[in-house]
Amino acid sequence: MASKKEAWKSELYGDEVREKIEEFAEKGVDAIPEEERDKWFTRFKFWGVFQQRTGQDSYFMMRLTNANGVLEPGQLRAIGEVARDYASGPVENPEFGDAWVDLTTRQSIQLHWLELEDIPAVWEKLEAAGVSSRSAGGDTMRNITGCPVAGRDKHELVESQPLLDRFQADLRGNDALSNMPRKFNISVTGCREGCAQDSINDVGLEPAKKEVDGETVTGFNVRVGGGLGSRKPRVARDLDVFVADEERAYEVVRGFVELYHEHGNRDVRARARSRFFVDEWGTEKIRDLLQEEYVDFELRSAGENIRDEYTYNAGRPESAGKHDHVGVHEQADGDYYVGLSVAVGRLTASDAIELADIADEYGSGEVRLTRRQNPLLMDVPEEKLDDLLAEPLLGKHTPVPNPFQRGTVACTGTEFCSLALTETKARTARMLRWLRDNVDVPDDVSQLKIHYSGCTADCGQANTADIGLFGMRAQKDGEMVEAMDIGVGGGIGEDPSFVEWVRQRIPADEVPGAIASLVEAFAERREPGQTFREWVEAEGTEAVTEYCVPEETDFEAPYMHDAKQSWYPFAEDEAQSEQTVTSD
């Protein structure tokens, strides 16, 4: 029997939902009958419109979409202006103030504190600049990820941006495929570093070569069924398929999308993700059915991986290759791109607008987003680099961050998410400064990947980090407080591994001390040149557990309490805050 949400989607979903959102926006959120809100808000997600957490019932988040994080000239400015004009909440964040944009781990952007009545005006402003929120959420194909410097990378192995653009236009744009069993992630990368993280996507294409008709050709190998979350992460499995051209790559991915769309589990949502589908069917059965019913050419067996070293978030030494896109890098055409480190991926509206101005002044105006919540300024001529790097904004969002800021990712947390158990962004921003000021890192270590997810859904990709944090709750001194599980040793790469959880339900005020003890042990006991992931593997989980010592420190934050019980973690007067939220 199909789930309740499947019944709602079968009645109305996809493009048709847009008209209903506009109707409700004209009448106001109160026009949505109370007993029908779950149904409508489930449908709204396809258009990137999410009601915020309980207590923020009159406010919405909007997630935007693109192909591979590419923001064309003018688009970031339009997004920043929307945030400035429409994304102001009733209470300021103590760390970030009011009105901002959040950069995500899928090369996308989220806006918060939007009112339903303003959604049509927000769409009008964004769509005039070519920015869309269609298919940005819900049970559909989400933002397609890839190498953010596709087409500019001087070491690109296989061209991928035209294929990504076609997936965006022809596959994600197909309303007949809008209603998937659950959310579905596609990645394509033709680079040598592996920055699309193919192994944690529902379907991923990675660069390969194969001899075809006596000639060695480059193309992609296909992997399926990867994903994180619910403490049941999976590495995508090899489908044993090689595709040598854009047309066949498109057809194979489309075929798997259609196969999952038709045969995926729609009865039990907890088992509906493609990773469970691949578990149950197996790659051989999926490949056979793909060949028989979904593609009209003979599938070739997998080719040879042509990456020398998979280095992006792989726990490899920096000498092996790039592990992110931060810094100044030469493009294939002789210009440069400059990757900035935005702490926890949050840009104020004014910073976003200023960044767009800087992109215009020093480069082509194009900005690209990475899977590590960072922006790239593209197409900067060499003669303009020094002036660009001297811009005051690049002192704040720097291309030369300290190792803690450079490696850290944080999800939305209890500030807006109903699933999260802890506040994430503001706490992490302050923790980064505390770690910078109190913990020494070896000179040859440029980054430590610390990923913080406010719950086990793992939007912050904690499973893939050097140090992964899951939001929890725990008792301390007789009170319920925010807490975290601590894991170590995760990473993507030729040999993907997920973190081993070494400490559970550590009160939030003891976590910075625990991280400090881990990093200090790493610095003292590592072999020369050893990365954190390599050190964890060498030491073993049991030993590393002993090194991870939770303790109170002088770290302070104004939100150590159990914020899950508050409508907003930073609201001081609960009664006044409730009145503010419901006054609309």
Regions found by a protein language model. Give the residues of each.
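Peripheral terminal and linker regions in Fe-S/redox and tRNA-modifying enzymes
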Residues: 1-584
